[in-house]
A protein has these predicted regions:
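Core, highly hydrophobic multi-pass alpha-helical transmembrane subunits of bioenergetic inner membranes
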Residues: 1-351
Length: 351
């Protein structure tokens, strides 16, 4: 997924100013759109995939501002905690018999404690929890954006997208880890698959300690950014507000209202990434699919079958049944045939 970002990091010197401005706008909108769409999803894999798309938008946006080292730093830290998050999600989906809907989960902290610990810590790293892997890169990116010469639109997109990241992370934890177990009542979960657990616990160490280690390795001198107290605390404030909104949105009443008839169009618009599937997938696939369906219906299942396989089979079957009917030892048939032959012979003699 991140190969394109890595290539752009390697060839960052060929990006001109106009291309960087266009890239900044598109990547910021992608980051905001993916974060907003993840808050309306109930598929565990889709939530994590949209989270990856949002973080890719963050990398591309900071790369378009000229900070290629910072984009590479976030690429590495994001790879660590997102790999752990995908492993935890795969373990949970496997234990729930390939069920991906987070509404069927709940109270997994009791049934799968080690997996949930790894999932919680990777979620907190994704949110930018202080001193985890994601904190060092995300906080530095937000401070660089606060210090840079960007307009208020890009500035708000960065911080609102950060709040949305915390929002869907807490929503995911609320549905999957807390509450009641909503799967089959007689279904038992297993948290003793040590092949997965050894890998997850090893990745957990990297998620906790790799942020500071990579910062020491990538940047030769410590980066010190002086900002006013309001801007320094803005990232923390946005994260806290995003966590609170994620908790409120996860409640049943809010979820029911958002899917009601009054607000369904808004939920559809935000959940389907601003009608992106309708523009990119559905509209492009509609004409070829309808054309192939009509050809299949009219030709393959229509005239081709009538004059081809089914028609020949039907005519041969009818002829065989007629001949078999004639060959039955029936006195009436023999008398009728004799009369027909006599009439035909009489007609021939008259000619």
């Amino acid at each position: 997924v991140t190969a394109g970002v890595y290539l752009l990091i390697r060839f960052n010197m060929i990006l001109n100013e106009n291309l960087c401005l266009f890239l900044l706008l598109i990547s910021s909108l992608t980051m905001f759109m993916a974060g907003l769409g993840a808050n309306f999803e109930f598929d565990l894999k889709k939530i994590i995939a949209l989270s990856t798309l949002s973080q890719l938008g963050l990398m591309m946006s900071i790369l378009s501002m000229g900070n290629y080292k910072l984009a590479f730093f976030h690429l590495l830290t994001h790879a660590l905690f997102k790999a752990l998050l995908f492993m935890c999600a795969g373990s949970i989906i496997h234990n729930l018999k390939d069920t991906q809907d987070i509404r069927f989960m709940g109270n997994l902290m009791v049934h799968m404690p080690l997996t949930c610990i790894c999932m919680n810590i990777s979620n907190l790293a994704l949110c930018g929890m202080p001193f985890l892997a994601g904190f060092y890169s995300k906080d530095l990116i937000l401070e660089v954006v606060s210090m840079g010469f960007v307009n208020i639109f890009i500035f708000l997109l960065f911080f609102i997208s950060t709040g949305l990241t915390v929002c869907y992370s807490f929503r995911l934890c609320y549905y999957s880890i807390t509450g009641d177990f909503n799967f089959y009542s007689l279904h038992s979960l297993n948290d003793e698959g040590w092949i997965m657990l050894k890998s997850m616990l090893s990745m957990l160490m990297f998620v906790i300690f790799s942020g500071s280690m990579l910062m020491w390795l990538i940047f030769p001198t410590p980066i010190m950014i002086c900002l006013p107290m309001e801007l320094k605390m803005l990232a923390l404030f946005v994260s806290v507000v995003g966590a609170w909104i994620g908790y409120e949105v996860s409640k049943f009443t809010m979820s029911w209202v958002s899917n009601s008839l009054k607000f369904y169009s808004y939920s559809y618009f935000f959940g389907f990434m601003w009608f992106m599937p309708n523009i990119s997938t559905f509209s492009m696939n509609y004409i070829p699919l309808m054309l192939s369906y009509n050809l299949f219906k009219s030709f393959d299942q229509g005239w081709n079958e009538y004059f081809g396989g089914q028609g020949m089979y039907e005519s041969m079957k009818n002829n065989s049944m007629f001949i078999q009917f004639l060959q039955n030892n029936n006195m009436k048939i023999y008398l009728v045939l004799v009369i027909l032959w006599v009439i035909m012979l009489f007609l021939i003699l008259m000619i």
